[in-house]
C-alpha cells in the first residue's frame, strides 16, 4: 500500500482531499483509551464530587460508559448520505452502540462483537472484490484487520468502543467528503489514519 493519512474530510491528507501527499511508511498505531468526562454542574458530576472538592470514583452506570458510544444519537440524515449497500451495516453498528451503552457496569456482549465482526467481514469482502484499486483500499483493509484482531478478545467497553468506531469508520470512508461524523473519527480513529503496512486483505488474514 502507498501511504496517506485520512480524517474523513477534516484532515489535509484525507484520501479524498485535493493534493494529498504520500508520507513515509508507518504501521497503524494502537488505539488509545477514551476518557469520558461528565460535564461540570450535571447531576452525575455533583454526585461524584466529595465534600473536599475532589472527584469520587466514577460510576460505570453513569455518563462515563455512555460517552464511549457517541454513535447512539446518529441522525437519520447521516445514514441517508451513505451508499445504499452500506446502510444496513451502519444501522447494525448504531443498534449495537445503543445496546452496549445500556449495559452499565455489566461487560459488553461478546456475541454482539462477534456479530459485528462477521457483518463487517462480509461487507468488506463484497466491496473488495470490485474495488481493489480504490483509493480507500488501505484504510478499509487496516480497519478490517483491526476489527478481526480485536473481536476475539473483546472484554471491556473500551474494546467495544474501539470495535464499533472502527466499523463505522469503514462505512463512512465511502462518503468521506460529506460525512457529518468526521469529527468523531478524527478523535477516536486516529490509529487508522496511517494505513501503511496494513497487511493483506482481511479475507486472507482473518478467520471466523
Curated annotation (Swiss-Prot):
Pfam families: Gene66
Keyword Metal-binding among record annotations: yes
Triggers of expression: Expressed late in the infection cycle.
Family: Belongs to the herpesviridae US10 family.
Keywords linked to the UniProt accession: Host nucleus, Late protein, Metal-binding, Virion, Virion tegument, Zinc, Zinc-finger
Annotated localization: Virion tegument; Host nucleus matrix
Record region (Disordered): 17-61
GO function term, MF aspect, one: zinc ion binding
GO CC, alphabetical: host cell nuclear matrix; viral tegument
Zinc finger intervals, unnamed: 167-179
Keyword hit for ATP-binding: no
Main location: virion
PTM remark: Phosphorylated.
Species, as recorded: Cercopithecine herpesvirus 1 (CeHV-1)
Highest taxon of source: Viruses
InterPro entries in alphabetical order: EHV_Unk (IPR000714)
Listed name of the protein: Virion protein US10 homolog
Amino acid at each position: 500500500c502507498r501511504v496517506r493519512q485520512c480524517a474523513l474530510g477534516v484532515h489535509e491528507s484525507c484520501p479524498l482531499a485535493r493534493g494529498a501527499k504520500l508520507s513515509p511508511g508507518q504501521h497503524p498505531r494502537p488505539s488509545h483509551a477514551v476518557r469520558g468526562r461528565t460535564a461540570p454542574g450535571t447531576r452525575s458530576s455533583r454526585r461524584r464530587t466529595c465534600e473536599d472538592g475532589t472527584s469520587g470514583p466514577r460510576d460505570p452506570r453513569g455518563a462515563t460508559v455512555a460517552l464511549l458510544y457517541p454513535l447512539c444519537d446518529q441522525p437519520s440524515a447521516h445514514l441517508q448520505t451513505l451508499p445504499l449497500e452500506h446502510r444496513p451495516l451502519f444501522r447494525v453498528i448504531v443498534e449495537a452502540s445503543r445496546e452496549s451503552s445500556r449495559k452499565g457496569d455489566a461487560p459488553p456482549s461478546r456475541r454482539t462483537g462477534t456479530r459485528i465482526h462477521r457483518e463487517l467481514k462480509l461487507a468488506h469482502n463484497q466491496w473488495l472484490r470490485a474495488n481493489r484499486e480504490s483509493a480507500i483500499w488501505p484504510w478499509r483493509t487496516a480497519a478490517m484487520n483491526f476489527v478481526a484482531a480485536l473481536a476475539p478478545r473483546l472484554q471491556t467497553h473500551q474494546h467495544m468502543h474501539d470495535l464499533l468506531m472502527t466499523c463505522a469508520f469503514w462505512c463512512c470512508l465511502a462518503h468521506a467528503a460529506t460525512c457529518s461524523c468526521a469529527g468523531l473519527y478524527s478523535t477516536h480513529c486516529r490509529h487508522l489514519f496511517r494505513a501503511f503496512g496494513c497487511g493483506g486483505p482481511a479475507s486472507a488474514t482473518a478467520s471466523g
